[in-house]
Amino acid sequence: MNQGQKTWLLNVLDKGFPNLKEVHHGSCTGSDEEFHNFATVLKLETHSHPGTSVNPKVTVLNRATLKADVTYPEKPFLVRNKTISDTCDLLIACPHKNSNTGGTWSTYNYAKRTGKLNILKR
């Protein structure tokens, strides 16, 4: 996440949803990790959904080492992304690139297609 996204997200988590109790993320380094840390500071319950490759020969290198309140079993990335979207009431996406490809975009686009309330913050 860029600094503007971080500032915005922390404010939204802290003040935007007073009834917010739990958050879900994909357990990757970078944005998921930062999101998890914000949620932890705000004493929100954290749910981690680690992803794995469908190819057993591929090692996942971008998994964050996080102590979530709830950690779900690994699922292939695209399946995991849909699970995260299906599980939440609101999906917040903060892509780090202007490209419309990758896991963040896959999850965001799935949420849009399925009518999930979503926010995209560039």
Protein language model regions, located:
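Acidic/glycine-enriched connector segments
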Residues: 1-122
